[in-house]
Amino acid sequence: MAGAAVLRRSARRIYRHLAAAPAFSRSVLQQPKRLLSSQSSPEHGARGAVSGSELALYPPERVRNFSIIAHVDHGKSTLADRLLELTGTIQKGHGQPQYLDKLQVERERGITVKAQTATMFYRHVSASQDSDTPKYLLNLIDTPGHVDFSYEVSRSLAACQGALLVVDAAQGVQAQTIANFYLAFESNLSIIPVINKIDQPTADPDNVKDQLKRLFDIDPSEALLTSAKTGQGLEQVLPAVIERIPSPPGKCDAPVRMLLLDSYYDEYKGVICHVAIVDGALRKGDKIASAATGRAYEVLDVGIMHPELKPTGVLYTGQVGYVISGMRSTKEARIGDTLHQAKSTVEPLPGFKPAKHMVFSGLYPADGSDFEALSHAIEKLTCNDASVSITKETSNALGMGFRCGFLGLLHMDVFHQRLEQEYGAQVISTIPTVPYIFEYGDGSKVQVENPAALASNPGKRVAACWEPTVIATIIIPSEYVGPVIMLCSERRGEQLEYTFIDAQRALLKYQLPLKEIIVDFYNELKGITSGYATFDYEDSEYQQSDLVKMDILLNGQPVDAMATIVHNQKAQRVGKELVEKLKKFIERQMFEITIQAAIGSKVIARETLSAMRKNVLAKCYGGDITRKKKLLEKQKEGKKRMKRVGSVDIPQEAFHELLKVSNSK
């Protein structure tokens, strides 16, 4: 009883102390949930909550949807930061540069991988000042700049009516600048040129204006001169967006119809879809259906990205936001799908062109028992990256795995890195390959994405082979033209164009086999041009070529995961490099290991990894020599038996090193 009295007295003292504490402390105790509210956190923007009634004040004519497109490192994400600060969407000095680059891989590599959307509210200077309500709603989409993520750019542009084309004032127009311009041009977007980084000592905005005029027929007077780093000239960007980019089309009184732009998986909320409202209005509680699958859903939550998720309860015509509708499977959220009012007949929106996969690679769990975990991780990640194709496959060497199609080698690397960082998956990748077409003597054709699927000695004779090619655009300083032409010739390239952009820079266009550029072409190009080259490519036609399948054999047994298709002229060199690399990374066994590269039944390269040998004569200090011979013969027979039944473990590092085998020497 005495103990209970002490506890009661202690509790009363604590309560009196809290009662005398500041009001903030008492409010936290009385309303603990408020401490966790995202709307109270300054990192979610200065505006706080946005209501549906506020969004109703923005009809389509007061909405602008625009994207920022540029070459890598020309200042897209920094410009996006400044615009978010200028509109009060995020606080100045938020301490996180490139705010919209949210993935760990983006921050580590310094590149944008995923297109990100942010809604901003902005009062145009020419608008009347009779109300505190912002006059315009601006949806900003920051896009990647690398060629491998052009699919992200094209999907983002589908939700926009205009684009800011950002060009570095010192570097000028680069290869990806050209590619992104034509993506926007073909989408009929209004393009506003922004010459960025004018604060640099080497900036030459007049020269950049001339390049824009010569290459794109853009009036030099239309270019905006800015520095996203210092803020110089930024005050003219948003007024130009409002005045020069049209409002989104759409019918406000029609049944709701929206385009599914992107999606990602949340463990608690399920699939979160990013959508652009084309017609009508979407409200919480509405019933919607998918035009692709026919499945119906109830809208559980709807809102905008400001720049984090902000529930509004409604989205109106022309606005871009998110929808949570109880989708639990990533297969239900098909990028480019049309979501519409349930039990109504609407015409589906055009959607997107399907992604064309340029690089294929096998993906296997480092530990075979982790296959289900890897399958789960890939399913969740492909919800956020719909440009990856996934099919299950089985390898004799590596067990159950997946054959994955990517848009390029960087895309493949980023996908692997995200698997590891976001899901803790440890994977083994096989040698990347491209889709080939083989024609047999009877006229039948087959597309081969996995070299192991092509029999080394098929019953049908191979009559012809085709490989995919690309049109490569290379921009370089004029003094490096010679070495670059030599590099392209070594990679079996055909020159299509050779022009000068200005007195210092040249533009080269080549038709190159895709196989020749997917591994190390860009690194070599950067090396021979001291880092000044820029490179972009677009897929072209298939061309006939002299191709052969090369197998890697360990102790006479082919390793299907290491099979590759090479050009006949380079088979000898590539085979020699492969077996040499394998010899370095395979651990020595108690038996001898022969490593061979073979085309059909013909071995073109070989290395031998000698066996570890136990000193069986250690206890023989003398005596009859026949005793020693008997021990040696017994050891020899044992090693032969081990070689017949022994298995060779191939470390993960060996597969990684095979990716680096050069195609150029």
UniProtKB/Swiss-Prot annotation:
The record's Gene Ontology cellular component field reads:
mitochondrial inner membrane; mitochondrial matrix; mitochondrion
Q: Where does GTP bind?
A: 70-77, 142-146, 196-199
Family matches, as SUPFAM superfamilies: EF-G C-terminal domain-like, P-loop containing nucleoside triphosphate hydrolases
Give the range of the organelle targeting sequence. Answer: 1-35
Q: Known EC number(s)?
A: 3.6.5.-
The record's subcellular locations are: Mitochondrion inner membrane
Q: Which InterPro entries match?
A: EF-4, EFG_III/V, EFG_V-like, EFTu-like_2, G_TR_CS, LepA_C_sf, LepA_CTD, LepA_IV
Segments forming domain tr-type G: 61-249
Q: How does it sit in the membrane?
A: Peripheral membrane protein
Q: Which Pfam families match?
A: EFG_C, GTP_EFTU, GTP_EFTU_D2, LepA_C
Question: What PROSITE patterns does the entry give?
Answer: G_TR_1, G_TR_2
Q: Which family does it belong to?
A: Belongs to the TRAFAC class translation factor GTPase superfamily. Classic translation factor GTPase family. LepA subfamily.
Name the UniProt record assigns to this protein: Translation factor GUF1 homolog, mitochondrial
Which species is this UniProt entry from? Sorghum bicolor
